[in-house]
From Swiss-Prot:
It is an enzyme of class 2 (transferase). Residues 4-187 form the YrdC-like domain. Residues 168-187 are annotated as: Disordered. GO terms for molecular function: ATP binding; double-stranded RNA binding; L-threonylcarbamoyladenylate synthase; tRNA binding. It holds the Pfam family Sua5_yciO_yrdC. Keywords: ATP-binding, Cytoplasm, Nucleotide-binding, Nucleotidyltransferase, Transferase, tRNA processing. This is Threonylcarbamoyl-AMP synthase. Its EC number is 2.7.7.87. It comes from Pseudoalteromonas atlantica (strain T6c / ATCC BAA-1087). SUPFAM superfamilies: YrdC/RibB (SSF55821). Required for the formation of a threonylcarbamoyl group on adenosine at position 37 (t(6)A37) in tRNAs that read codons beginning with adenine. Catalyzes the conversion of L-threonine, HCO(3)(-)/CO(2) and ATP to give threonylcarbamoyl-AMP (TC-AMP) as the acyladenylate intermediate, with the release of diphosphate. Transmembrane segments: none annotated. Belongs to the SUA5 family. TsaC subfamily. The keyword Nucleotidyltransferase applies.
Length: 187
């Protein structure tokens, strides 16, 4: 870590384990450092989400996701389809690495990952030099926040708000299985 990072408020909060809300391609998301178990647990508590469900990681590029993915276990027949869909709003369930944190993968042998085209997400991932947890900014049973005001109404001052514009998608990312190609979520 170089000295110029010490005055980056986002990076300081990220490294301190804070949870933040930020615009994604379609809705506001909640994020944190995927390697910080306390931060992920705080995010899950805010969302009222069970850890067993797992979470999505979003990166600036596939290289950022490699520590969490067992790249050698991705079927050769699926690689072109997966990698040609990025950057973009498609999340893939890929085989998890042996070191992928259980608080991110839940009870699955797979990990949900996406390479984003959203300029703000790309910037945040570049500044952190790693992926972010990315899950919709809402609590169980409520629709995802579509504005900074909605984020504030859901979470008050419990998250750090990074304001910005949503991307052009009308719904959260499609989720597909990296082995079967089956669509798991098609909003």
């Amino acid at each position: 870590m170089t000295a110029n990072h010490t005055d980056d408020p986002f990076l300081l909060d990220y490294l301190a384990g804070k949870v933040f809300a930020y615009p994604t391609e379609a809705v506001f998301g909640l994020g944190c450092d995927p390697d910080n178990e306390q931060a992920v647990n705080k995010l899950l508590a805010l969302k009222q989400r069970d850890v067993s469900k797992g979470l999505i990681l979003v990166g600036d590029n596939y290289s950022q996701l490699l520590p969490y993915v067992d790249d050698s276990a991705i079927k050769m027949t699926k690689r072109t389809e997966i990698f040609s869909s990025w950057p973009g709003p498609i999340t893939w369930l890929l085989p998890k690495s042996k070191t992928a944190p259980s608080w991110v993968t839940g009870e699955s042998e797979f990990i949900a990952v996406r390479v984003s085209a959203h300029p703000l997400i790309k910037d945040l991932c570049q500044r952190a030099n790693k992926p972010l947890v990315s899950t919709s900014a809402n609590t169980a049973g409520h629709p995802p926040a579509l504005s900074a005001d909605e984020v504030t109404s859901y979470f008050s001052n419990q998250v750090i708000l990074i304001d910005g514009s949503l991307g052009g998608s009308r719904s959260p990312s499609k989720i597909r299985h990296g082995h079967s190609g089956q669509t798991i979520r098609d909003n």
